[in-house]
A protein has these predicted regions:
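Substrate-binding strand-loop-helix patch
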Residues: 182-187, 210-222, 238-258, 274, ...
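C-terminal "lid/loop" region of Rossmann-like NAD(P)-dependent oxidoreductases
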Residues: 208, 236-239, 250-253, 261-282, ...
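N-terminal Rossmann-like NAD(P)+-binding domain of SDR-like oxidoreductases, especially those catalyzing
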Residues: 1-179, 249, 308, 312-313, ...
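Glycine/proline-rich active-site loop of Rossmann-fold NAD(P)-dependent oxidoreductases
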Residues: 154, 179-192, 199-202, 218-219, ...
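Hydrophobic "lid"/C-terminal helical patch
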Residues: 18, 193, 225-229, 253-256, ...
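A short C-terminal helix-loop "cap" of Rossmann-like NAD(P)-dependent dehydrogenase/epimerase domains
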Residues: 49-55, 167-170, 194-205, 231, ...
Length: 329
């Protein structure tokens, strides 16, 4: 009998891809989506009807203790991805990040403890490391709260750790580096660049071009989640999902310009630059741990992942909801 799994944040970018991947692997999937009066299931609405019919939808709010407990009834394993993630928005609305990212994670952990859930995977972020003090960044690297967003994710990670150590809850903290691919929000750098280029703009507005990122294609990310969940050795661990490589934002932008509109040039837009102490200047992750504990390997190099992403955005049906002319926060 297949395991019944809950994916929180299933209506979002990574969550919707994870739902698809788990369905392909034969799991019985329940999707926790954010309640809204439009009955929108987010990116799940774009899946083929055959896939949609296989998904059990639960509309709720991760901040609501009772709703979370109800959603987790009868669940063998939970992949907790629901979170607020936009860094600029966290500067002026930090309360909402505490409520969603910390309290939401606590709700998942409490329900799992009470219900005896077999496995809990809590999603972290490479942002918790802050600017690299050494590379490649392994799981022992110090954590630095360089934004309200990353501070709340550090808090959520430590709560997850505490439930493992205090109550022996079978928790794993999964820490993907910068994931990109089809369906990603325009607040992220790759969709920002692509949507401007495909609109015909010849002046591409970006922030600081110097920071480097370890860019992970979404299919590698979700496969990492699934493989981590399959090995008991990962319980109680914090595990990076990374390519163990890096590229600067400037070089990344130039790569996409070459592929789509060679006449375009980059313009630095001051409003897109983070406060100097908040900017994470280098992220370059180690993937030694995930490789030692599981059978995961990257399958997409950057060129293949970027081309797949550009191809998806090139479909008018996909790009029509993106507002390339504004700064998406």
């Amino acid at each position: 009998m297949s395991k019944k799994v809950l994916v929180t944040g299933a209506d979002g970018f990574i969550g919707s891809h994870l739902v698809e991947h788990l369905l392909e692997k034969g799991y019985n999937v329940k999707a926790f989506i954010y309640y809204n009066s439009f009955n929108s299931y987010g990116w799940l609405d774009t899946l083929p009807k055959g896939k949609q019919d296989q998904i059990e939808i639960f509309s709720g709010d991760i901040r609501d203790t009772n709703g979370v407990r109800e959603a987790m009834q009868g669940i063998d394993m939970v992949f907790h991805l629901a979170a607020l993630i936009a860094i600029p928005f966290s500067y002026h609305s930090p309360d909402s990040y505490v409520d969603t990212n910390i309290k939401g994670t606590l709700n998942i952990l409490q329900a799992a403890k009470q219900l005896g859930t077999e496995r809990v995977l809590v999603t972290s972020t490479s942002e918790v490391y802050g600017t690299a003090q050494y590379v490649p960044i392994d799981e022992k690297h110090p954590l630095q709260g360089q934004s309200p967003y990353s501070a709340t994710k550090i808090g959520a990670d430590r709560l997850a750790e505490s439930f493992y150590k205090s109550f022996n809850l079978p928790v794993t903290i999964v820490r993907p580096f910068n994931t990109y691919g089809p369906r990603q929000s325009a607040r992220a750098v790759i969709p920002t660049i692509i949507s401007q280029l495909l609109s015909g703009m010849e002046e591409i507005k970006l922030g600081d071009l110097r920071p480097t990122r370890d860019l992970l294609f979404v299919e590698d990310t979700v496969r990492g989640f699934e493989r981590i969940s399959c090995f008991s050795e990962t319980i109680g661990e914090e595990i990076n999902i990374a390519t163990q490589s890096e590229i600067s934002i400037g070089d990344l932008a130039n790569k996409m310009i070459e592929l789509t509109n060679p006449k375009a040039k980059i313009i630095v837009d001051e409003q897109r630059i983070r406060p100097s102490k908040s900017e994470v200047f280098r992220l370059f992750g180690s993937n030694e741990k995930i490789k030692s504990l599981t059978d995961w390997e990257t399958q997409f190099d950057l060129s293949a992942g970027i081309q797949t992403t550009i191809d998806w955005f090139s479909d008018n049906e996909n790009i029509k909801g993106y507002k390339h002319e504004i700064y998406n926060v």
